[in-house]
Curated annotation (Swiss-Prot):
<feature type="active site">
    <location>
        <position position="91"/>
    </location>
</feature>
<keyword id="KW-0732">Signal</keyword>
<dbReference type="InterPro" id="IPR009746">
    <property type="entry name" value="LipidA_acyl_PagP"/>
</dbReference>
<keyword id="KW-0998">Cell outer membrane</keyword>
<dbReference type="InterPro" id="IPR011250">
    <property type="entry name" value="OMP/PagP_b-brl"/>
</dbReference>
<comment type="function">
    <text>Transfers a fatty acid residue from the sn-1 position of a phospholipid to the N-linked hydroxyfatty acid chain on the proximal unit of lipid A or its precursors.</text>
</comment>
<comment type="similarity">
    <text>Belongs to the lipid A palmitoyltransferase family.</text>
</comment>
<keyword id="KW-0012">Acyltransferase</keyword>
<keyword id="KW-0808">Transferase</keyword>
<feature type="active site">
    <location>
        <position position="135"/>
    </location>
</feature>
<keyword id="KW-0472">Membrane</keyword>
<dbReference type="GO" id="GO:0009279">
    <property type="term" value="C:cell outer membrane"/>
</dbReference>
<dbReference type="GO" id="GO:0009245">
    <property type="term" value="P:lipid A biosynthetic process"/>
</dbReference>
<feature type="compositionally biased region" description="Basic and acidic residues">
    <location>
        <begin position="49"/>
        <end position="59"/>
    </location>
</feature>
<feature type="site" description="Role in lipopolysaccharide recognition">
    <location>
        <position position="100"/>
    </location>
</feature>
<feature type="signal peptide">
    <location>
        <begin position="1"/>
        <end position="28"/>
    </location>
</feature>
<feature type="site" description="Role in the phospholipid gating">
    <location>
        <position position="205"/>
    </location>
</feature>
Length: 219
């Protein structure tokens, strides 16, 4: 009986010798896996933190920043020079007495010059100055910035339609040539280098409500 117990004890001891390295190996593998997982999570966390930090450092530009960038880019890197020729002034007959419109000038003789470019989206940006005869046949200068979103319905893209705005400053004789800020709608139809552009000056009865159009030639 004692011999049998001794044999069992030796067998148990030998089994333990074989099992201990196995447990050690499994423990090492688990430790390595846990370490790798921790490193991966730490790396992902660092990457997320860096992206969040970059987002906080580089916020989307504001409207004024975009406007300033567009003005600067148009002035410093124009793609074309433009000749402006005033074409027509029309006083809205539904908002004027005939006695008024009969004596108003609707032939805005004058000229202007500007620079322009197309951005990466194909939209139009311009800086310009222009002078023309106003409704009282007096000289009226205007200058500013123009923007149009452009559409090209044909495959050859020679014909373009534009819709946007112009912001600038004008001066009139009947207002003693005091600088007056203006913000007006802008629309155009273009064929290759020639554009017919127009704006509408809103107003009240017998005041404002004027359609003003001009030709623009790129060279």
């Amino acid at each position: 009986m004692r011999l049998i117990l001794i044999s069992h004890s030796r067998l148990f001891a030998l089994s333990a010798l074989f099992l201990i390295p196995t447990f050690d190996s499994l423990s090492a593998e688990n430790t390595l896996t846990d370490s790798t997982t921790l490193i991966d999570r730490t790396t992902q966390s660092d990457s997320t933190t860096q992206r969040d930090s970059k987002t906080r450092r580089d916020p989307a530009p504001s409207f004024w920043q975009r406007a300033s960038n567009n003005l600067s880019e148009t002035w410093q890197h124009p793609q074309s020079q433009d000749l402006y020729v005033p074409a027509i002034t029309w006083h809205n007959r539904w908002t004027y007495d005939r006695a008024k419109t009969d004596k108003y000038n609707e032939r805005p003789w004058g000229a202007g010059f500007g620079v322009s470019r197309l951005d990466s989206d194909g939209d139009w940006h311009a800086l310009y100055v222009m002078a023309f005869k106003d409704s009282f046949n007096k000289w009226e200068p205007i200058g500013g910035y123009g923007y149009e979103k452009r559409w090209r319905p044909l495959e050859n893209q020679d014909i373009q339609f534009g819709l946007g705005f112009t912001a600038g400053v004008t001066m009139r004789d009947n207002w003693h040539y005091i600088p007056i800020p203006v913000l007006l709608p802008l629309a155009s139809v273009s064929y290759q280098r020639l554009s017919f552009q127009a704006t509408y000056i809103p107003g009240t009865y017998n005041n404002g409500n004027v359609f003003f159009a001009w030709l623009r030639w790129q060279f």
